[in-house]
Amino acid sequence: MKRELALEFARVTEAAALAAHKWVGRGDKEAADQAAVDAMRTILNQIEIDGEIVIGEGEIDEAPMLYIGEKVGKTEEISCGLEAVDIAVDPVEGTRMTAQGQANAIAVLAVGNKGSFLKAPDMYMEKLIVGPGAKGVIDLNLSLLENIENVSKALEKPISELTVAILDKPRHKDVIADLQKLGVKVFAMPDGDVAASILCAVVDSEVDILYGVGGAPEGVISAAAMRALGGDMNARLKLRSEVKGITLENDKISNYERARCEQMGIDLTKVLKLDDLAKDDEVIFSATGITKGDLLERSEERRVGKECLRLCR
């Protein structure tokens, strides 16, 4: 994949962030998301690529969002020689944070060669992510305590000095309490586990581990970032009823998720390694801040590009 494409894809997240920024603090997360989607699609269709959205915002019947299977790129005038790429997008990671004017909302995408990324339905995913210093020591088949002990040894840090990032959701209440009983420092975020996953792998960050259940699309994007940063990741797909509890509606959604996984040849019981999520190192990752945050400052019209994180290998 041509490295100069990294600059083109940086324009995509910058445009999405600027569009969403106009809705910061206005209480309308759908409008913020739609503005970012429209901007992202417009710029993607100006790039000379043969692109396909493999991780997006739902299925084809949920258009006008950037849906799974949507074709993007400037293909009308060029019939051959285009880069064939798979694209994972999250136009606004942290729609609620954007609507409420809270920190750490970002626009993000990852790009890889055709077939690079796991194609999974938009469902929940259990994630365990670490930086380069603990690469190869995590395993979701083990308990969280065992993984924390292994990371502690790899990083040569006592457990009391480890920091675990986790989404501050009701489903994680017991996990957070258990971590704090161990003496682990907990960084509990309202939303936005992609930004937190990157903090695991960057120099001078306090975050050592990301754990918890979040979105599968965000998980694949995090995997691409770990490829670029040399980190590591394990994941396992989760049905809605496993995460949200058993109700008629949750069971209906879970049955659909199970059927989609069967169609895609995905084993729900399998622990997915980094190689399963992002299959090679030739990836481009771009993120731009919408609101101020721990990873990126917000994007402003006078400062476009200065708050964009571009990673490629």
In which residue ranges do the predicted regions lie?
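Short glycine/serine/threonine-rich phosphate/pyrophosphate-binding segments
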Residues: 87, 91-100, 105-107, 173, ...
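Conserved small/polar residues in nucleotide/adenosyl-binding loops
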Residues: 301-308
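N-terminal hydrophobic or amphipathic helices/low-complexity stretches enriched
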Residues: 1-16
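Short acidic loop-to-helix transition motifs that present clustered carboxylates
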Residues: 59-62, 171, 190-197
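Acidic beta-strand-loop-alpha-helix segment within the catalytic core
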Residues: 108-188, 281, 293-295
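Flexible, acidic active-site loops/lids enriched in D/E/S/T/G that coordinate Mg2+ and/or position polar
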Residues: 33-114
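Glycine-rich phosphate-binding loop
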Residues: 193, 202-236
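Active-site-adjacent structural elements in enzyme catalytic cores
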Residues: 78-91, 98-127, 131, 178-182, ...
